[in-house]
Amino acid sequence: MNRALHEKPELTNARADFYGRMAEQSMTPLWEVLHTLLSDAPVTDATPHKWDYDLCRPYIMESADVISAAEAERRVMVLENPTLEGRSCITEALYAGLQLIMPGEVAPAHRHSPAALRFIVEGSGAYTAINGEKAYMEVGDLILTPSWVWHDHGHDGDVPVVWLDGLDIPLVRHLGPVFAEPYPEAEFPKGRPTGDNVARYGGNMLPFGDTYSSQNSPVFHYPYTQTRETLETLAKSGDTDPRHGIKLEYINPTTGGPVMPTIATYMQMLPKEFSGDAYQTTAAWVYHCVEGSGQTIINGDTIEWKAKDTFVVPAWYKHEHRTNGDSFLFSFTDQPVQKKLGLFREAA
């Protein structure tokens, strides 16, 4: 015998009276709300959406005339999911935004408990300094600012630089442990030389006697030139996944796991005229097109994308990628949290 999930019981006068008296002790009846708390499949308030960079860019550039990086702390245009209006998030657990820094500017040093990533969209010559070590930006680079590390941004070049921010702020706010602290000066004191993090931990070797132990990757700069070369080399084998093309995860080299405990990051190469099988998971995915163009069909609706566009696939939405030519998609997801809690699922 099949049994349906709980439905809301009939509200009688006697029950309404009982509920009113119960409320005086800050109690409510579970059976009145159980149907909203449990469901036969994940329910999300987020909706699929694309941010066309050509339409967003004029506002990004105009923001430089409206407010300085120093006054804004971080001059970011939040990519707010249209069905999560006012909540400053792209999904219930993830935040995304497009940040601008102009030549000569400094976005002052601070640190916070939410973890963050920067994926470079446009320009070069700017940098992020992590505990004083500078990572210079090129389009397609991934730069991490993990939880509670000092970081500031600056610009030694001569063209505007824009990057995609990805953070776990909504998740951390929901759980409660949000902390933030400004550094007393605009810039953190000079640290290790540029490239030290990659040399120390990114060459498939570890320094002798190293005792590094953290869920955050000690490598915080993943250059796109290396990522792209790796994907192109793998493409020569012809071993293409029917759902993902050729997809690689950026990892913490000391653990083999995700770069940060709450956010996993990926880059995938989808060959010309790729038509992928559907993929469905309990995690939400934020995609950004680095090169190429194509379409993603999300629960039957098609999103057209091209280089520099960003789009979101909420939890438990089926999606399948199709391409016009060779395309490269960066993505980040809340998958690691669900895996650690034993909640992550993929549809067969």
List PLM regions with ranges.
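Double-stranded beta-helix
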Residues: N2-R15, D156-N216, F220, T323-A348
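Conserved metal-binding segment of the jelly-roll/cupin
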Residues: I130, Y136-G157, W163-D168, I298, ...
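C-terminal structured domain segments across diverse proteins
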Residues: T254-G257, I263, M267-M269, T282, ...
